[in-house]
């Protein structure tokens, strides 16, 4: 399988693939990313020698910034492709590990949630699902994974606030396996991946399948959130909020993209001022 343009694939270590996201300038997911991830899954499923896959980013500031909503709106079928990808990733015999540095929001967070294990840089990771703050709801698995991993109340805090959460809080909530000092992250994940790659694939697959019995989202559950996403995208309130973020740095290297969660409450205050009745 040729290496797709946004996914650099390293197959040099026996039994292990390392996938590096590389879509400058801020590692946004676009429709072609999702298509390439589907092709990647086909390759993983077809190669009986692969036991573990590690996902990382070429950009230390952005693991995955979020979805490019404008491009996705032109290809609404991509959410169905995304649903299929995350379900396949959860079900495949290959063990998936997310090695996380940088901002990991929206579909980026939904991606790491669908991985089997998540390890994050303590100094350089922020997680979030900011969709509610821009007039949407998460449509790619966050609403299904978060309650299973962190519980209902914390899932509500994460989704309804749209705020950014650091790696230490994510570890405390059960969102990630561990928060590690940035200097230790690479060696820890490498050691774990090598350990897993030394075991029998059939045994790893059987253990993963048995654990999956106790809680992975179904296609119908994720589809339910998919079905809300594009209708909400068309709402005037959502369009107005997206117009504001486009004007302050959405989709480009900017303070807004670095600190997305901090900006969201300002949109609500702007609505309050607009709707205020004159004395």
Which positions does each model-derived feature cover?
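C-terminal alpha-helix plus adjacent terminal tail
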Residues: 1-14, 60, 162, 166-167, ...
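Hydrophobic/aromatic residues within transmembrane alpha-helices
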Residues: 19, 55, 68, 111-113, ...
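Charged catalytic carboxylate motif
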Residues: 32-36, 81, 88, 188, ...
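Glycine- (often His-adjacent) and acidic-residue-rich active-site loop
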Residues: 35, 49, 57-88, 104, ...
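Catalytic-core regions built around general acid/base machinery
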Residues: 40-43, 81-93
């Amino acid at each position: 399988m040729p290496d797709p343009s946004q996914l650099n694939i390293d197959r040099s270590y026996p039994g292990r693939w390392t996938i590096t996201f590389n879509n400058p300038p801020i590692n946004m997911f676009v429709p072609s990313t999702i298509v390439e991830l589907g092709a990647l899954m086909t390759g993983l499923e077809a190669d009986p020698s692969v036991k573990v896959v590690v996902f990382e980013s070429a950009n230390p500031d952005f693991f995955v910034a979020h979805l490019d909503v404008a491009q996705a709106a032109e290809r609404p079928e991509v959410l169905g492709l995304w649903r299929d990808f995350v379900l396949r990733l959860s079900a495949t015999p290959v063990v998936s590990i997310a090695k996380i540095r940088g901002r990991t929001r929206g579909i980026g967070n939904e991606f790491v949630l669908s991985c089997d294990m998540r390890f994050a840089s303590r100094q350089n990771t922020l997680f979030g699902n900011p969709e509610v703050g821009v007039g949407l709801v998460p449509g790619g698995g966050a609403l299904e994974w978060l309650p299973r991993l962190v519980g209902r109340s914390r899932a509500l805090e994460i989704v309804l606030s749209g705020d950014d959460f650091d790696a230490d809080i994510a570890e405390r909530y059960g969102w990630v396996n561990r928060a590690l000092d940035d200097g230790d992250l690479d060696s820890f994940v490498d050691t774990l991946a090598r350990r897993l790659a030394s075991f029998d694939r059939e045994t790893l697959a059987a253990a993963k399948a048995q654990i999956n019995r106790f809680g992975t989202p179904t296609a119908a559950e994720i589809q339910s959130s998919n079905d809300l996403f594009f209708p909400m995208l068309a709402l005037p309130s959502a369009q107005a909020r997206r117009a504001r973020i486009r004007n302050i740095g959405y989709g480009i290297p900017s303070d807004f993209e670095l600190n997305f969660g901090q900006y969201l409450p300002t949109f609500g205050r702007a609505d309050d001022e607009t709707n205020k009745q004159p004395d």
